[in-house]
Amino acid sequence: MSEQIFELKGNLFTLSVLHLYSTDINLLAEQLYIKIAQAPKFFEGAPIVVNLIEIKNNSLDFVHLKSLLERMSFNAVGVCNGSDEQHTQAKAAGLSVLNYSQDVKSESVKKEPNTSIVEKTVHLPAQIINGTVRSGQQVYAKDRDLVVLGAVSHGAEVIADGNVHIYGTLRGRAIAGAKGFKNAHIFCNRLEAELVSINGNYWISDSLQGEHWGSAVQIQQKNESLEISALVKG
């Protein structure tokens, strides 16, 4: 019997989800272009899933949609929360259909812009990285804090559903509160980041290069924006 050369295992990966509210692909292209221009490296090659929960008809051109996403350097993985007909059309366009259990279909489209968000407190022990997160690497601490005892290099990305603690220099990207925990913080010993994000609010390098650039800081969300303050050293 020959030696087994593969093994199939389940795993978890971080995917961006595009919540689509219109079938107008041209308008989507315009708005995506503006969004991507704010942080082009952050979205480059990012795997993305299109959430169809708010699309109530079958007029969406999935071939055009897939082409648009790939043209903008996304990796179009598939769709979720669509109708059977939408899923059939998506498959014909070369998109996968994913089950997305975190989304609950609403009975009707809500007209009020305010949405209730239930925060999930992180209880699991922190995930600790004993060293530097190097360029091209991505670390995700699911349902917990992330502690990096070294630096986060350019082109590296650290993500946590809770807080992110970096005991070295943050040169790459740090994302805290990835599942909507708005009270998450990012702490780092030296701020030189490409991007920081908390609960979906993010700043890129140009916005960070102020008085706290190169310093030890904590970053938190206040009033739907980010706030940076110096870490007090005892």
UniProtKB/Swiss-Prot annotation:
Gene it is expressed from: minC
GO biological process terms on file: cell morphogenesis; division septum assembly; regulation of cell division; regulation of cell septum assembly
Protein name: Probable septum site-determining protein MinC
Superkingdom per UniProt: Bacteria
Keyword flag Cell cycle: yes
Function: Cell division inhibitor that blocks the formation of polar Z ring septums. Rapidly oscillates between the poles of the cell to destabilize FtsZ filaments that have formed before they mature into polar Z rings. Prevents FtsZ polymerization.
Keyword entries, A-Z: Cell cycle, Cell division, Septation
Keyword Cell cycle among UniProt keywords: yes
Organism listed in the record: Pseudoalteromonas translucida (strain TAC 125)
UniProt subunit comment: Interacts with MinD and FtsZ.
Lineage, top ranks: Bacteria, Pseudomonadati, Pseudomonadota, Gammaproteobacteria, Alteromonadales
Cleavable signal peptide: none
Protein family membership: Belongs to the MinC family.
